[in-house]
C-alpha cells in the first residue's frame, strides 16, 4: 500500500508521504509469528519475565531488521540491558548519547552496581531450587557479601523475574533421567553423607 500510495501522489503532483521501513517479528525458526500457531512470545509474556526497559532496549536496536521474539531471547536481552547500564557509569556525555539505555530512560540512566547477570541468576534458581525471592536472595548474598537489597531495585526485580521465567520456561522443558541401580546407590550414599554433616561445617569442608 505504501508503494501504491506513492504512485498515486506522484500522479496528482503532490509530495510523497514519509514512509518507515520495518520488519515483522519472527519465532526461533525464523517464521512469522502467528496468533493461530501460538509461536513466539507475546509482549505480555515478555513483561512477565523481564522489565519494560529491557523490552524497550530490544525494540530500540536495529529497527529495520527483523527481530526474533521467543522465550529464549529474553535472558540475552536482559543481560544486554544490564551491560549498557554498567557501561553508562563510566561514560562521558557524548558516549552516553550512543548508549541506548540513555534514550530508554529519557536521559536518566539508573546507577546500580551489577551483582550478576540474569543468565547467572537463572542458573542459581535452577541449582538452588529457590521458589521465592527471600530464599533466592539468601543464595545471592552467599555469592556476594554485604549486599543491601534496597540499594539494588533493578536486581531485586530480576530476582522475581528469574523465578517466574524458570518455572514457566526452563522447568517445563526439563527432562529428568531415572537413575539406574548403580547411580541410585551412589545418590543414596551421597544423601547419607550429607545428612551426617553438622551445621558448623563450611561448604569447603563438606566438599572435601
What are these regions (language model features)?
Residues 138, 142-208:
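Basic, alpha-helical terminal appendages of large translation-related enzymes
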Amino acid at each position: 500500500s505504501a508503494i501504491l500510495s506513492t504512485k498515486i501522489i506522484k500522479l496528482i503532483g503532490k509530495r510523497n508521504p514519509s514512509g518507515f521501513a520495518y520488519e515483522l517479528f519472527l519465532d526461533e525458526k525464523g517464521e512469522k509469528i502467528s496468533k493461530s500457531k501460538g509461536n513466539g512470545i507475546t509482549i505480555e509474556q515478555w513483561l512477565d519475565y523481564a522489565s519494560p526497559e529491557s523490552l524497550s532496549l530490544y525494540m530500540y536496536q536495529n529497527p529495520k531488521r527483523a527481530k526474533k521474539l521467543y522465550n529464549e531471547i529474553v535472558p540475552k536481552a536482559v543481560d544486554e540491558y544490564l551491560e549498557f547500564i554498567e557501561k553508562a557509569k563510566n561514560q562521558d556525555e557524548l558516549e552516553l548519547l550512543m548508549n541506548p539505555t540513555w534514550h530508554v530512560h529519557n536521559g536518566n540512566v539508573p546507577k546500580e552496581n551489577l551483582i550478576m547477570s540474569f543468565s547467572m541468576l537463572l542458573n542459581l534458581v535452577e541449582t538452588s531450587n529457590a521458589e521465592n525471592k527471600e530464599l533466592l536472595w539468601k543464595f545471592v548474598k552467599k555469592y556476594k557479601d554485604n549486599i543491601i537489597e534496597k540499594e539494588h531495585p533493578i536486581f531485586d526485580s530480576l530476582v522475581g523475574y528469574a523465578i517466574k521465567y524458570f518455572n514457566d520456561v526452563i522447568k517445563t522443558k526439563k527432562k529428568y533421567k531415572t537413575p539406574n541401580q548403580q547411580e541410585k546407590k551412589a545418590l543414596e550414599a551421597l544423601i547419607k553423607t550429607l545428612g551426617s554433616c553438622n551445621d558448623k561445617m563450611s561448604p569447603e569442608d563438606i566438599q572435601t
